[in-house]
Amino acid sequence: MGSSCRIECIFFSEFHPTLGPKITYQVPEDFISRELFDTVQVYIITKPELQNKLITVTAMEKKLIGCPVCIEHKKYSRNALLFNLGFVCDAQAKTCALEPIVKKLAGYLTTLELESSFVSNEESKQKLVPIMTILLEELNASGRCTLPIDESNTIHLKVIEQRPDPPVAQEYDVPVFTKDKEDFFSSQWDLTTQQILPYIDGFRHVQKISAEADVELNLVRIAIQNLLYYGVVTLVSILQYSNVYCPTPKVQDLVDDKSLQEACLSYVTKQGHKRASLRDVFQLYCSLSPGTTVRDLIGRHPQQLQHVDERKLIQFGLMKNLIRRLQKYPVRVSREERSHPARLYTGCHSYDEICCKTGMSYHELDERLENDPNIIICWK
């Protein structure tokens, strides 16, 4: 499990009929101080309004996650059993991935109590200590855990890491597989995704995939969005030989990182050719600059490109942020014309987007804008 949500302590707290709220067990021992527990106990053993709800509270540089349980029955002292099995993490930890685990444990313990009085029986309750120890060790080590409770009950837990929302897939974006396409089994995806997978080649943009696969554009965008979420694809811009790129500071990683070198040279070498040299590839990346198109690069460096596929070179550079694209954004300096596509000339819409929305080619758009004295081109 990632260090960002490492569990520092697991505790079991309950309401004692004479002592009130207390920590019965904690692993490791004495991790939660008396002062800390006194500060947060109203959120550990709670009023009825907060019972059976997930609660996260931060105090004294620690974050405590719990789900207070209340089981009402006349067999219990004060007619109710109140307990909470929770986790303690660093106050800065991202604990969203742990919350379902805490909620699930509360449900399991409730079921065990209702079936066999597991929590209220002092003898069986002592089994919680080894269970909590296994929980702490295995969840921190691998993010998953199997807990044998008794002969008929086993608990299986797994931390599901929260993924950030992926970028929105626009019609002019180009999806590229992050690993070998053959590594993915199309049968595991929905029917729309299965239909578009053969058309994802790292060069077709979303709109073109939609047209060639005969799938409605919004459905393609949703499918690509799903593939982005799971890290199956990433997005790059449309590759044309008139494009302009420049290296980023990360291009230095190509010199320092051996695994990146290996991945790069394997990716950019022409099929059936002698392996490209790092020197040639690095020189090609560093030769990209404002004002230099891909076509210019090919004309100036035929020797270095002898074993290098220039399309794969650009593709890999974009995927690994070794280079970035400088795009053209038309800006209309007069406000006279608001017709389509003039309303796209605001400096906020790139050539890629305008061409996709209007159906014009780059050459047609270039000619139209070059002959318009009210248009200036912003590169960014």
From Swiss-Prot:
Cross-link Glycyl lysine isopeptide (Lys-Gly) (interchain with G-Cter in ubiquitin): where in chain: K158, K357
Compartments reported by the entry: Lysosome membrane
GO molecular function, one term: GTPase activator activity
Residues bound to GDP: R78
GO cellular component: a single term: lysosomal membrane
Pfam family, one: NPR2
Entry keyword set: GTPase activation, Isopeptide bond, Lysosome, Membrane, Methylation, Tumor suppressor, Ubl conjugation
Principal location class: membrane
List of residues that carry Asymmetric dimethylarginine: R78
PTM info: In the presence of abundant amino acids, ubiquitinated at Lys-158 and Lys-357 via 'Lys-6'-linked ubiquitination by the WDR24 component of the GATOR2 complex, thereby inhibiting the GATOR1 complex and promoting mTORC1 activation.
InterPro entries reported for this sequence: NPR2-like
Changes seen on gene knockout: Embryonic lethality due to defective fetal liver hematopoiesis. Embryos also display reduced methionine levels. Lysosomal acidification is impaired, leading to defective lysosomal processing of cobalamin and methionine synthase. Conditional deletion in skeletal muscle causes constitutive activation of mTORC1 signaling: muscle fibers are significantly larger and show altered fiber-type composition, with more fast-twitch glycolytic and fewer slow-twitch oxidative fibers. Mice with a conditional deletion in muscle also have altered running behavior and enhanced glucose tolerance.
Any Gene Ontology biological process: negative regulation of TORC1 signaling
Disulphide connectivity of cysteines: none
Family: Belongs to the NPR2 family.
Function: Catalytic component of the GATOR1 complex, a multiprotein complex that functions as an inhibitor of the amino acid-sensing branch of the mTORC1 pathway. In response to amino acid depletion, the GATOR1 complex has GTPase activating protein (GAP) activity and strongly increases GTP hydrolysis by RagA/RRAGA (or RagB/RRAGB) within heterodimeric Rag complexes, thereby turning them into their inactive GDP-bound form, releasing mTORC1 from lysosomal surface and inhibiting mTORC1 signaling. In the presence of abundant amino acids, the GATOR1 complex is ubiquitinated and inhibited by GATOR2. Suppresses Src-dependent tyrosine phosphorylation and activation of PDPK1 and its downstream signaling. Down-regulates PDPK1 kinase activity by interfering with tyrosine phosphorylation at 'Tyr-9', 'Tyr-373' and 'Tyr-376' residues. May act as a tumor suppressor. Suppresses cell growth and enhances sensitivity to various anticancer drugs.
Name by which UniProt lists this protein: GATOR1 complex protein NPRL2
Organism: Mus musculus (Mouse)
The gene coding this protein: Nprl2
